[in-house]
Amino acid sequence: MPEITLTVNHKAGLHARPAATFVQTCNRYKSNIRVKHGDKDVNAKSILSVLTLGANQGAVITISAEGEDAEQALSDLTKLIDGNFGEGG
C-alpha cells in the first residue's frame, strides 16, 4: 500500500476548514485512504475521525491509500497539504 509522510504547516493544523478540505479531497477517490498521526490511524474520509488526530501545525502525518486511484489520491493530497489547503495559512 503506497504511503506518504508530510508535515502539516497550516497555522490551524488539520482542524476546522483544513480538515474539511482534506476529507472532501479524500472522498473524491474510490481508494481506501487512512491517515496516521502518533498512535492514531483513522479513516481519512471521516471528518470526525480526522479531527480526533489532534494534528496541529508542525504535525507529521502519514497518509496511505489502497485502490485503483491510490497514487493520484496521494499526489493530490500532497499538493493540498504542501499548498496549505489553498488558504495560504
Question: Residue locations for each model-derived region?
Answer:
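Hydrophobic alpha-helical segments and their boundary regions
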Residues: 2, 43, 72-73
